[in-house]
Amino acid sequence: MVEYASKEPSAFAEMLGGLIGANVTSRPEKKQDFDTLVARVGIWVTDIDEGVTLAFDAGKLTVHNGLEPNRTLTIRAEAETVMSLSNLRIGLFGMPVYYDEVGRGVAAKLLQGRLKIDGMLSNIATLNRVTRIFSVQ
């Protein structure tokens, strides 16, 4: 289900791969999203100058060290902000909740430019699906 492109994945790559693997294994609704998602999602953590590319391929995830080309979405933020994305609650119709404390914090960082998501507007459905898979809530 989750594999690593490098024989020596970074700690960040292992952490994200492990988080997603655990979420998908323990929650049927996340598995359904995972099994249908085909996208390449880059995550660049600005304060540690490190990133990964999550290559989702309909039930399989390959985690790459660094940003690989041809990404559908690229998320750029500090480590704390990236981790807060995993705490977003998922509400009605599978949409992320932005009206609680965590959601307001994420929305504020997006508006302030402290969270940047390249490709967001043209791939909002993909972003929502990735958020559902990534969220531990």
Task: Locate each region found by the language model.
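Feature captures hydrophobic
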Residues: M1-Q137
